């Protein structure tokens, strides 16, 4: 039987974090067994503009009229912490779509003062089997609007589009946040720009990799502004990329810079460790400015490394 997962949202005293195990501030749980609640989690920003940040949780095997349709839960923050009853449950109404396989804040894509969210459904069918889809939802005074502002897709059979979704920051510095979606089985990632109307459904950039089995796009993330030029950047992992020599499945991560036109499609930096089958790039994320030098930093996971 598939396990039912839960997540703990933890707030603790930073000065004590290395000497004792912190207690959970809140525990939010799914209401259906084998739904894989908690497979994907993210902060959601402040979706209702009340001054308290919110969270989003995916449960991609949830049955809600359709088998394994999947759902995503929005939980609102408050002065007492996270409300453990969901404010909203999002769904896509298609069986086996894997809706909620990935979830993320989208930033404020229409610059209305309310943060927005994006949800991936990597097995969604719309003319092509398992092409995948990503759904963008806008925040408002009452929270997330359950009707998507935009649905994004790539029209490629078996692309796994939506296996990874993320806010991309504001890559062209126009005041509207942008999003990025990975499609690892077609070794691509797609970047979409925000606007006053929401997300433009025509991608501004398509990023790709020359190795067909590299899993490029399995992980995608905003990187912050790594070169402090005023344009946000993105990072993409390809955890099965084969490097030189015996470096099979060593993995790699690519950093792309933003500019006034959108995103420069040639990588500015290529990161790798050069070890055999360590899956470098399985996870990627912006890290903030960890040394406070004015340049944002990144973090890359290498989950099969054994040192």
Q: In which residue ranges do the predicted regions lie?
A:
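Bacterial Sec-dependent N-terminal signal peptides
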Residues: 1-22
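Conserved beta-strand/short-helix segments
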Residues: 18-307
């Amino acid at each position: 039987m598939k396990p039912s997962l839960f997540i703990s949202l933890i707030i603790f005293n930073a000065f004590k974090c290395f000497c004792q195990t912190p207690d959970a501030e809140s525990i939010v749980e799914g209401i259906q067994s084998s739904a894989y609640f908690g497979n994907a989690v993210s902060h959601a920003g402040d979706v209702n503009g009340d001054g308290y940040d919110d969270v989003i949780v995916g449960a991609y095997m949830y049955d809600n009229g359709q088998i394994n349709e999947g759902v995503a839960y929005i939980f609102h923050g408050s002065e007492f912490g996270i409300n453990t009853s969901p404010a909203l449950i999002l769904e896509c109404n298609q069986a086996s779509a894997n809706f909620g396989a990935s979830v993320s804040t989208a930033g404020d894509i229409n610059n209305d003062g309310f943060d927005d969210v994006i949800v991936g459904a990597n097995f969604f069918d719309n003319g092509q089997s398992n092409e995948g889809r990503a759904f963008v939802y806008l925040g408002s005074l009452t929270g997330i609007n359950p009707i998507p502002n935009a649905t994004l897709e790539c029209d490629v059979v078996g692309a796994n589009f939506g296996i990874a979704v993320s806010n991309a920051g504001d890559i062209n510095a126009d005041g509207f946040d942008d999003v990025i979606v990975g499609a690892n089985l077609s070794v691509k990632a797609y970047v979409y720009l925000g606007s006053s109307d929401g997300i433009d459904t025509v991608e501004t950039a398509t990023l790709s990799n020359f190795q067909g089995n590299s899993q490029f796009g399995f992980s995608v993330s905003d990187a912050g502004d790594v070169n402090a030029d005023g344009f946000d950047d993105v990072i993409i992992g390809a955890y099965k990329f084969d490097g030189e020599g015996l470096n099979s499945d060593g993995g790699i991560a690519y950093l792309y810079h933003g500019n006034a036109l959108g995103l420069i499609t040639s990588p500015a930096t290529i990161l790798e460790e050069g070890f055999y089958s360590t899956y470098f790039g399985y996870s990627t994320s912006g890290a903030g400015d960890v040394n406070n030098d004015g340049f944002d930093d990144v973090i890359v996971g290498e989950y099969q490394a054994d040192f």
